[in-house]
Amino acid sequence: MRGETPTLKDIVLFDIPTCETPIDLYCYEQLDSSDEDDQAKQDIQRYRILCVCTQCYKSVKLVVQCTEADIRNLQQMLLGTLDIVCPLCARVE
């Protein structure tokens, strides 16, 4: 192309040869489902949580098994209105 704007003679068209047999573009590859399961299992981890009972102020240990996103949600709930009560205080009420 010469000049600032293209003209019709600047455009070159090529003939695409046609095939007598159609080309199959379908991909017959299948993913192994165990890879997806392994990935999901890797995302789930155990977390140890040490918090304080809101009634008697004793330490309460929790172990949860969840994804990182879920542990972040739990953290936000603990910072909000969610309170943990120890088993002794739970029996009293």
Swiss-Prot record:
A motif (LXCXE motif) lies at residues 25-29. One of its GO terms (biological process) is DNA-templated transcription. A motif (Nuclear export signal) lies at residues 71-79. Keywords: Activator, DNA-binding, Early protein, G1/S host cell cycle checkpoint dysregulation by virus, Host cytoplasm, Host nucleus, Host-virus interaction, Inhibition of host innate immune response by virus, Inhibition of host interferon signaling pathway by virus, Interferon antiviral system evasion, Metal-binding, Modulation of host cell cycle by virus, Oncogene, Transcription, Transcription regulation, Viral immunoevasion, Zinc, Zinc-finger. It is found in: Host cytoplasm; Host nucleus. Homodimer. Homooligomer. Interacts with host RB1; this interaction induces dissociation of RB1-E2F1 complex thereby disrupting RB1 activity. Interacts with host EP300; this interaction represses EP300 transcriptional activity. Interacts with protein E2; this interaction inhibits E7 oncogenic activity. Interacts with host TMEM173/STING; this interaction impairs the ability of TMEM173/STING to sense cytosolic DNA and promote the production of type I interferon (IFN-alpha and IFN-beta). Plays a role in viral genome replication by driving entry of quiescent cells into the cell cycle. Stimulation of progression from G1 to S phase allows the virus to efficiently use the cellular DNA replicating machinery to achieve viral genome replication. E7 protein has both transforming and trans-activating activities. Induces the disassembly of the E2F1 transcription factor from RB1, with subsequent transcriptional activation of E2F1-regulated S-phase genes. Interferes with host histone deacetylation mediated by HDAC1 and HDAC2, leading to transcription activation. The E7 terminal domain is an intrinsically disordered domain, whose flexibility and conformational transitions confer target adaptability to the oncoprotein. It allows adaptation to a variety of protein targets and exposes the PEST degradation sequence that regulates its turnover in the cell. This is Protein E7. It comes from Human papillomavirus 42.
